[in-house]
Amino acid sequence: MDGVSTAILLLLLAVISLSLTFSSRGKGQLPPGPKPLPILGNLLQLRSQDLLTSLTKLSKEYGSVFTVYLGSRPVIVLSGYQTVKEALVDKGEEFSGRGAYPVFFNFTRGNGIAFSDGERWKILRRFSVQILRNFGMGKRSIEERILEEGSFLLEVLRKMEGKPFDPVFILSRSVSNIICSVVFGSRFDYDDERLLTIIHFINDNFKIMSSPWGEMYNIFPSVLDWIPGPHKRLFRNFGGMKDLIARSVREHQDSLDPNSPRDFIDCFLTKMAQEKQDPLSHFNMDTLLMTTHNLLFGGTETVGTTLRHAFLILMKYPKVQARVQEEIDRVVGRSRMPTLEDRTSMPYTDAVIHEVQRFADVIPMNLPHRVTRDTPFRGFLIPKGTDVITLLNTVHYDSDQFKTPQEFNPEHFLDDNHSFKKSPAFMPFSAGRRLCLGEPLARMELFIYFTSILQNFTLQPLVDPEDIDLTPLSSGLGNLPRPFQLCMHIR
């Protein structure tokens, strides 16, 4: 292409971008924000290395509701507890759409629970919640699975006693096995190739999506499709994960008994058979594969990442670790594993777990939302179809809700009588209509794993506690703890 042709192409792109920008502005009364450039939008004001920090700084200048342009696309950004709560909870239906997230959408194509929308999302979510409840989510039966998996983890950790190790893979295998048992019908041995492959794909993709490459792809997907980089590996991983799930689905089809479903896949296949004559049915192979992927991804990475944050925090603050262990010894003792019934008798431990989730803020910007209709909001009119970013980080670090938000402080979740105190600004699983459907399972896992490990081990860092850096490595999709090793000593 010669220079003249290139110039003409760039001019056309600029005109198209400007027309899209101004047409989108004209559809409603959008909140203020930094002035966008043609094609680039607000790219110059948004550091791809740390989009969260950039948006948080802009909120201080433009207020709790403002507009940024990701390329030519306007996106509303909400910050602070009151604003986010008003959108996700008070106006839950209007803000219940799923916003554009090309990193995922180019794989899921709008199928599955996490990235579907409208009636399809409502039907899939209702079905998935019911099936997960039938298989014990939030009940004693799933607690027994967690206790069993926790005991396997403790066996592995005892073999590591006194030896430095990286906890990433050990935790991921154990946590993933719980959701695998619900989805596939049975747990895997820790050296099973299928489990190891699942963990590799999920861990690697979470890192990429939480990196600048992931952020840039979400802004300029059509451009980065032509550029080499880690995002290419991300889609290869997605494809490998899809193939693995499809293989398991075929195995289920060969042995399916509709009258005796063994797991989530069996239930979905049975529903597909029941609605196979309905051309409008949302139960098909694509939605099964993507829904299964969503469950595995969500049920593996966030809990494992939160536990790693907890390890770092407890090693940096050994007095907190010792106080938790004292409460465990007093309430549970050493002769049995902690159970969920113990939680109400362990207010300090419960407060520490909640404070870990608040402070670590694993999903700081939430998944994007979208307004489902023209929506009046705080003096503005947000047009139907506009994407919305809710900065959960600004909720968890809201000084009006937490006394010392920049510090790790379990007192945030304790009242004057040292009883556990809930906070309405606690939103690690989001809030409203799009609340993570795996929240009950994740909360159970966190409590049982956290208490079981501290009942049996003391965590020791390889460096001086004062030198432990709690600043997350990434602030994209997820806040990842910095890589570390530790020693566990049997108590």
From Swiss-Prot:
GO terms for cellular component: endoplasmic reticulum membrane. GO terms for molecular function: heme binding; iron ion binding; oxidoreductase activity, acting on paired donors, with incorporation or reduction of molecular oxygen, reduced flavin or flavoprotein as one donor, and incorporation of one atom of oxygen; oxygen binding. It comes from the Eukaryota. Its cofactor is heme. Heme binds at residue 436. Pfam families: p450. Its EC number is 1.14.14.-. GO terms for biological process: naphthalene catabolic process; response to toxic substance; trichloroethylene metabolic process. Transmembrane segments: none annotated. CDD domains: Cyp2F. It is found in: Endoplasmic reticulum membrane; Microsome membrane. Keywords: Endoplasmic reticulum, Heme, Iron, Membrane, Metal-binding, Microsome, Monooxygenase, Oxidoreductase. PROSITE patterns: CYTOCHROME_P450. Club cells in lung and liver. It is a peripheral membrane protein. PANTHER family: CYTOCHROME P450 2F1, CYTOCHROME P450 508A4-RELATED. Involved in the regio- and stereoselective transformation of naphthalene to trans-1R-hydroxy-2R-glutathionyl-1,2-dihydronaphthalene in the presence of glutathione and glutathione S-transferases. It specifically catalyzes the production of a very reactive and potentially toxic intermediate, the 2R,2S arene oxide, that is associated with necrosis of the unciliated bronchiolar epithelial cells or club cells in lung. Belongs to the cytochrome P450 family. This is Cytochrome P450 2F2. It comes from Mus musculus (Mouse). The gene is Cyp2f2.
